[in-house]
């Protein structure tokens, strides 16, 4: 085999190697995107079901048994979180019991989803603004992490009384 033929064979092998590398790189990117998309859909499902669960609870501890017209009677932000008798999520009776709540959902096929919840009073006309005083609008923010997600996902829902 002449040196020209050897160069052509080597050049062909190099091109074939580059083609194979690009194929595997593209396949890897596709798989990563597939798993990230599936994890995003699963996280959204977890957040949605948690928001729906929260919507079945009373707006505030004082509204579990009666109505109120006074914002001053609502729970102080510093007192958000479960009461001492509310040791599990099934015992929560109002929205702010979920404040600071953390749980791991591993029922799906992509491993563990770490979920944490923060509750704040917000300005009713602008739910993106946290209120320093008690209002008749609370914002629930759910943060979800998973090993297939590049970034922590954040879901927000506002509840009004």
What do these predicted ranges mean?
Residues 41-161:
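Low-complexity, Gly/Pro-rich coil/beta segments used as flexible assembly/activation regions
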Residues 3-48:
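Aliphatic-rich helix starts adjacent to a transmembrane/signal segment
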């Amino acid at each position: 085999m002449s040196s020209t033929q050897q160069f052509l064979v080597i050049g062909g092998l190099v091109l074939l190697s580059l083609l194979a590398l690009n194929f595997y790189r593209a396949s890897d990117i596709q798989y990563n995107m597939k798993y990230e998309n599936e994890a995003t859909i699963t996280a959204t499902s977890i957040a949605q079901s948690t928001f729906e669960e929260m919507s079945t609870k009373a707006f505030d501890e004082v509204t579990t048994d009666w109505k109120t017209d006074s914002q001053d009677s609502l729970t102080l932000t510093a007192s958000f979180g479960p009461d001492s008798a509310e040791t599990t999520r099934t015992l929560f009776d109002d929205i702010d019991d979920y404040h600071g709540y953390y749980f791991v959902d591993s029922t799906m096929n992509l491993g563990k989803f770490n979920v944490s919840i923060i509750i704040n009073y917000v300005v009713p006309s602008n739910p993106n603004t946290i209120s320093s005083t008690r209002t008749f609008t609370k914002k629930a923010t759910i943060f979800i992490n998973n090993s297939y997600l590049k970034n922590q996902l954040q879901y927000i829902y506002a509840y009004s009384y």
